Amino acid sequence: LDREGLVFSESSFISDFNAIQTAPRVKRSAIGEVFVNWKDLRFDATDGDQYFQKIDINGEIQWGEGILLDENEFTNFSARFSAGQNGDVNIAYELGTFPNIEIMMQNISSEGSFSFSTPLNISNKDGYQFAPNLIGTVESGLFVIYADESSGSIDLKVQKVESGYLPSWDDNGITAMFGLGGDINYTSSYRVDDGEIYFFWEDNRSTKKIYGSRIT
């Protein structure tokens, strides 16, 4: 769509492979490329797998049948992603089976190949980590935000990923808030400058309030 309405006279398939595809998400890069994520049932008819497609500025798909995010035997889901600066896309996602869920990260290059053979384990801890969010680029500051319930209570964690895709902070990231339980809703994050974000959420621990934090 543009300001005048539909751009193409006919819609196009997101993948060259004919399979059931559900739950699409879309992000646009700074230069107009579009990345699409969906749950694909071609190999797993129950839980599905996370797939990605890149669409160029002319509306043409670039990655054929789509890119399977993780070939691990464990279920991969809840993918969140952010366009890079070189035609690539950064992805954070959940991997595993409850109650043992890890937050993983992968980068798909502009050509449709993985930037590292083994996904980066962001949480790297036993127990339940969930609800990843991702903002920024490695050049300007890439932050992965997630919930950690490994201690029994829910902590809000943030990890910064440096150039070369190495975690910046020890202990699986900094703990932005402790013991949130189920009282946090509607998280939002905004890039302010290189290596700096504002993070907001609805906090219901005592009464409904909007909280925010600056993370550098």
Enumerate the language-model features and the residues they cover.
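Extracellular, repeat-based ectodomains that mediate carbohydrate processing or recognition
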Residues: 1-216
